[in-house]
């Protein structure tokens, strides 16, 4: 084993981190979509 395998910085599950990243990015784009839709409806 090398030093990186011995000294792991984070013991958390990678699936949890990837799920959080997916939800955050999806929420950001969903927020942009909602804002654009509201602006489109107000402007019409």
Curated annotation (Swiss-Prot):
The UniProt entry lists the main location of this chain as membrane
Report how it sits in the membrane. Single-pass membrane protein
- Which residue ranges traverse the bilayer? 19-39
The entry's keywords = Cell membrane, Membrane, Transmembrane, Transmembrane helix
* UniProt cross-references to InterPro entries, sorted A to Z: YqzM
The cellular component terms of Gene Ontology attached to this UniProt record, alphabetical and capped at eight, are:
plasma membrane
Which subcellular locations apply to this protein?
A: Cell membrane
Q: Which Pfam families match?
A: YqzM (PF14141)
Protein name from the UniProt record: Uncharacterized membrane protein YqzM
Q: Which gene is this protein's source?
A: yqzM
